[in-house]
Amino acid sequence: MSMYPGWTGDDSYWAGAGTTASSQSASSGTSASASSSAAAAAAANNLKTYELYNHTYMNNMKHMLAAGWMDNSSNPFAYNPLQATSANFGETRTSMPAISQPVFPWMKMGGAKGGESKRTRQTYSRSQTLELEKEFHYHKYLTRKRRQEISETLHLTERQVKIWFQNRRMKHKKEAKGEGGSNESDEESNQDEQNEQHSS
């Protein structure tokens, strides 16, 4: 089976290139008028060969699209040879029938569960970050009631506030460790574990 399902296998393109070279070498010994007519015939032959090659190429591209090997719908800026050369044949991409392509399980996004999509990273606005940092400056740990208040004020979920504080405490711990406060960070990690058990 061929790699390209619609490939016709005709060698007319390569045969046309050979006849052009032989017609040019034969015309080199004749008069100027014969040479110009031979050149015109060679040019016409080259044009026919090009059109045949282009037509065959376009058919192969259509078959590849039909087989689902090429799909530019995910990238609208990708080069599409059908759009680039279809002006020669009076065709457009929209005139082709819509082809439904099969979606195999390995093509789907993999998550922990079948229908679960990967969670995106939460970005906080400057005002949200400022308020969270301000609260962290005064209180490294939040009570459930305070976490609810902050989440309502900043339009975040309680889970987002909780995770932000966990991450901020880890950052604070790393910063303290970098300054040489290893004893403080050990005490803080024990306190982190105790407070997490009480606040959850």
Swiss-Prot record:
Annotated tissue distribution: Expressed asymmetrically in the QL neuroblast.
Lineage top rank: taxon: Eukaryota
This protein's UniProt keywords: Developmental protein, DNA-binding, Homeobox, Nucleus, Repressor, Transcription, Transcription regulation
One GO CC term on file: nucleus
Subcellular location: Nucleus
UniProt KW Lyase keyword: no
Pfam families attached to this UniProt entry: Homeodomain
Record-stated family: Belongs to the Antp homeobox family.
Entry GO MF terms: DNA-binding transcription factor activity, RNA polymerase II-specific; RNA polymerase II cis-regulatory region sequence-specific DNA binding
Keyword set includes Transferase: no
SUPFAM superfamilies, alphabetized: Homeodomain-like
One Gene Ontology term from the biological process aspect of the record: neuroblast migration
Stated name of the protein: Homeobox protein mab-5
Phenotype caused by lack of the gene: Defective QL neuroblast daughter cell migration. Lin-39 and mab-5 double mutants have reduced sex myoblast specific expression of sem-2 in the developing mesoderm.
Region spans: Disordered: 164-200
Role played: Transcription factor that binds to the promoter region of the transcription factor lin-39 to repress its expression in Q neuroblasts and thereby direct left Q neuroblast (QL) daughter cell migration. During postembryonic development, required for posterior-specific pattern formation. Within the posterior body region, controls epidermal, neuronal, and mesodermal cell differentiation.
InterPro entries per the UniProt record, alphabetical: Antp_homeobox, HD, HD_metazoa, Homeobox_Antennapedia_CS, Homeobox_CS, Homeodomain-like_sf
Organism: Caenorhabditis elegans
UniProt biased composition (Acidic residues): 184-194
UniProt short sequence motif Antp-type hexapeptide, positions renumbered to this chain: 103-108
